[in-house]
């Protein structure tokens, strides 16, 4: 009798708990569906947001963790309008809320202050009005806050100064008013974070507040002119906007500089100023390091600390005085008069490109003889090293991680092309330049080191930069680079991810195979040997349909004509499952009627196998 009574109670308890669990599991889905109902979606990007599905992790533009909690909502540049909803505050585990470049209006819900795990809040380039919620000061893990290019009004909440993790702040191009806070995390931000808010005043701007004494913004640091010695003729250009006071001071005490010069070790080829005369200079969170700091960090650029070598110079592992690990890129370039100004300008541009999937520039060092860039150290190396140089004791990249790398790197490149002004063309997209952070999230590195692309014009270079096997045919033959140059390199990188092979490998000649990875892949596809393409390290632990989809994206990206390649923003959408089937079907129809595409011979590259061979509408679907 007692056992029967317990059984009855157990059944009743289950009837109570199961609905409660369903409600809890579906809370995030309900919150996102509320957002969908408040948004106008002309392109149907939210079509997969089905409220009948308990788990929103199956929806496009939504990313979940292993516990099926929503950690990312990515709806940037989706032509959405409407308003946000307070229910967004129920996404307790959300880390990234990306709603930039839409037409969303109304106020920013104060409930966003409940998202205490939020790392990045990107609402820029919308039509938001009203004040910045004071509750955003609760987001103590927030690193990126970009609310620029809206119509926000009122004062800047002082609560934001308590967010010590804040690295990037952009409130520019709004209607904010009052005094800019200057304490806490705000002490490191420059006027560029608050530009084009006519009613703002205070030290964070160039305008003093009423009743306050006038002030002059601090001038940018002006590097000293090196001491002249026999056989030396180096000189430096002035930094734009700098003043000559610092240089004049140094010339007033030449004995100090000369004494320092005499104390240098004969084998050193550096020129630096004493640490006490090289104050820290911050551009937002960008630090200017002294050369001595980086010499100490890298053990005087010891060969044992070399992480890699590339077309731009060597990269050294270093440990700063605070114990943090960094990667120091020591650039090799010819010194030209005025080069300091150009270098600082490019450094500032690179530092403004901040995205989860871009390698963040931590600082720089500039002397008359040295140019160095300081980045966070990526402990998991590059995709190339993980594919082909991993120790036997470490597991290979699994298929799920490779898919994440494909999507993350696409998002990073899309940001460089569509959200940087001027846009940044990478020009050397390859597996070796896709780094992996501690969570194996893709981080695009080495961007901005080539000449920056002007917003409107195609950049023509006298020297083609890039790596054999990754260079787009039109770039190799004409020297003209564009976003589509990067798209081609990205497509080759996808093939590296799928196959584990190098983009150019003479070893394939031993089997009478093509040395170019793209041609090798196309040859196997013509023979319908898809299983031969996949990296053996995966040991068949992959999903066939996902491999096919990734190959389709790679082939679309590596078409011979740059005009026929998708933009990186389109690539992101295709990887998220939006529009790939239609684009692939369209491509197949064109290939059926198209004759063999012949490009003109590449300049100085007769040995290169043409990578634009017709695939005759290769089928990548159906049973095998």
Swiss-Prot record:
Catalytic activity annotation: L-seryl-[protein] + ATP = O-phospho-L-seryl-[protein] + ADP + H(+); L-threonyl-[protein] + ATP = O-phospho-L-threonyl-[protein] + ADP + H(+)
EC number: 2.7.11.1
Residues the record marks as active site: 428
InterPro entries in the cross-refs: Kinase-like_dom_sf (IPR011009), Leu-rich_rpt (IPR001611), LRR_dom_sf (IPR032675), LRR_N_plant-typ (IPR013210), Prot_kinase_dom (IPR000719), Protein_kinase_ATP_BS (IPR017441), Ser-Thr/Tyr_kinase_cat_dom (IPR001245), Ser/Thr_kinase_AS (IPR008271)
Annotated signal sequence range: 1-25
Biotechnology: Over-expression of a truncated intracellular domain of BAK1 induces partial suppression of endogenous BAK1 expression, leading to an erect leaf phenotype. This could be a potential tool to improve rice grain yield at high density planting.
Residues on Cytoplasmic side: 259-624
Name this protein carries in UniProt: LRR receptor kinase BAK1
Induction conditions: Induced by benzothiadiazole (BTH) and infection with an incompatible strain of the blast fungus Magnaporthe oryzae.
Binding-site residues, ATP: 307-315, 329
Gene name, Swiss-Prot/TrEMBL: BAK1
Pro residues bias spans: 210-227
GO molecular function, one term: ATP binding
Keyword terms: ATP-binding, Brassinosteroid signaling pathway, Cell membrane, Glycoprotein, Kinase, Leucine-rich repeat, Membrane, Nucleotide-binding, Receptor, Repeat, Serine/threonine-protein kinase, Signal, Transferase, Transmembrane, Transmembrane helix
Alphabetized PANTHER family for the sequence: SOMATIC EMBRYOGENESIS RECEPTOR KINASE 1
